[in-house]
Amino acid sequence: MAFKSGFVALIGRPNVGKSTLMNYLVGKKISIISPKPQTTRNSIKGILTLEDAQIIFIDTPGVHPPKNKLGEYMVKVSEKTLKEVDLILYIVEAIDNGIGPWDEAIIERLKEVETPKILVLNKSDLASKENIEILKSIFSTKLNFESIVDIAAINGYNCDLLLDKIKELLPEGPKYYLDDMTTDVRESFIVAEIIREKILLNLSEEVPHGVGIAIERFAERENKDILDIEATIYCEKDSHKAIIIGKGGQMLKKIGMQAREELEMIFGIKVNLQLWVKVKKNWRDDISAMKMLGYNLKEV
């Protein structure tokens, strides 16, 4: 049997479960998960290597109207990804009542792309069979899909079937990455994303989306028993800084504790995490600040 390989983009409106699905399929946390929209800011690759295939999943930023240069960057990243992959997984919620404005916009964008597509109805464990069939019919009138699969990424229901459908549609090709690689992003990027996830989970309103993380230090001690990490949380307003720090520093301490615990699980070593908070006004409209915070504008 010929070996297959290829790049698979995950697209869908915010919070339909793109990151949850990629993390489940890869078997490791690669992309951050939050109930808030616009959680993913970069195209993040998750790599799954099987005996007969290597699948590189790309979790694209959620499609949304841009409000600043960071938003424009996110849209460009998503558009560029769709043009370069071998297959697109268009993810919607099986509990939807129909096609809303978000999905109408995505459908119009996908009509411009000839790449093969699979419709993925996520959260099918929460939906009736009748609703699933209705959605299949509605979406099929809008786009041509090579396959339609209903899944539940949270518990893996039908994910094996989805993998089989993906492999069927991928071309024959080489292994692009080593067998033990599950992502191509730097460790410092993963650290920044975990910290940002904890901010998203603990804070509300506009504060989390005005936050950027700079990793100042990432180094193992000589005896390799402790990983020292120093990071600066940048926000856009003094009032946001006060919220992130919290009364008596309690919120920052909580964010740091949650991030440290997860980082220790990921790296398998004790982590000494130090966090600072600084204000950099309007950084999401500042190209130099965006570059400093790790957004590779050259790619788009």
Swiss-Prot record:
One Pfam family matching this protein: KH_2
Gene3D superfamilies documented for this protein: 3.30.300.20, P-loop containing nucleotide triphosphate hydrolases (3.40.50.300)
Positions bound to GTP: 12-19, 59-63, 122-125
PROSITE patterns: G_ERA, KH_TYPE_2
CDD domains: Era, KH-II_Era
SUPFAM superfamilies xrefs: P-loop containing nucleoside triphosphate hydrolases, Prokaryotic type KH domain (KH-domain type II)
A GO CC term attached to the entry: plasma membrane
Cell location: Cytoplasm; Cell membrane
PANTHER family xref list: GTPASE ERA (PTHR42698), GTPASE ERA, MITOCHONDRIAL (PTHR42698:SF1)
Subunit structure, as described in the record: Monomer.
Region of interest (G5), residue spans: 151-153
Organism: Caldicellulosiruptor bescii (strain ATCC BAA-1888 / DSM 6725 / KCTC 15123 / Z-1320)
G4, as annotated region: 122-125
GO MF terms held by the record: GTP binding; GTPase activity; ribosomal small subunit binding; small ribosomal subunit rRNA binding
Database matches in InterPro entries: G_ERA_dom, GTP-bd, GTPase_Era-like, KH_dom-like_a/b, KH_dom_type_2, KH_sf_prok-type, P-loop_NTPase, Small_GTP-bd
Protein name per its UniProtKB record: GTPase Era
